[in-house]
Regions:
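Extracellular receptor-binding modules and their adjoining Ser/Thr/Gly/Asp/Asn-rich linkers
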Residues: 1-87, 91-96, 115-193
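Extended, low-complexity, turn-rich repeat/linker tracts enriched in Gly/Pro/Ser/Thr and Asp/Glu
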Residues: 110-112
């Protein structure tokens, strides 16, 4: 499945909010209106509604740095695989689809032939408690593994999409990248522009 890097909308398109991805488009999809106004598709946090007119920023990054570069795959995965599982560690629990439209990053390994630096788009993931629970990432079929991943030797990381569960920004809470001003109210867990 491929998507245009930019879509062009009409006035009023930015006021749409719904429980499934708008137009089946990925989080972060750019939409430009006739006057040049720009909007990106985002998803409200599962427990918090979006307030129209409020300024939003990227949600706080998980403090468990293991998620970014030190996860060990639960098995060996062949070229063409579209799912990769890892065992959670540290204190981070993972919610369902927390990494939707985010990235699986190959952080590296010992030895030659490492696919270090490769990244793959995440379609979905299951929930997993902290400690020693298995989390399975499902990759988009067109972005299947191009290099095999060997269990126990490769380190991986996961990165959430910037438009997944943004949080409201106030003058004293700017902690990350600003994602924009919500043009409408949206229910918790809904997709919106």
């Amino acid at each position: 499945m491929s998507f245009p890097s930019v879509i062009y909308g009409d006035f009023g398109d930015e006021k749409l909010a719904q429980s499934v991805k708008i137009g089946g488009l990925p989080l972060g999809q750019l939409m430009i209106l006739p006057d040049g106004s720009k909007f990106r598709q985002a998803r409200a946090p599962s427990g918090t509604a979006i307030v129209a007119g409020s300024l939003y920023q990227v949600a706080a990054r998980n403090s468990d740095t293991m998620l970014y570069k030190s996860l060990i795959p639960a098995a060996t995965y062949a070229v063409g695989a579209t799912s990769v599982a890892f065992t959670t560690g540290g204190t981070a629990s993972i919610t369902t689809n927390q990494f939707e439209d985010g990235w699986l990053m190959i952080a590296g390994s010992a030895g030659s032939g490492s696919p270090k630096g490769e990244k793959y788009r995440i379609k979905s993931n299951n929930s997993a408690a902290s400690g020693s629970t298995t989390c399975t990432l499902t990759l988009y079929p067109e972005d299947a593994l191009k290099t095999a991943i060997a269990a126990g030797t490769i380190r991986i990381g996961v990165v959430a999409n910037d438009y997944q569960s943004p949080v409201v920004t106030t003058a004293d809470t700017v902690l990350d990248v600003i994602v924009g001003v919500a043009p409408i109210a949206a229910s918790a867990g809904f997709y919106y522009w």
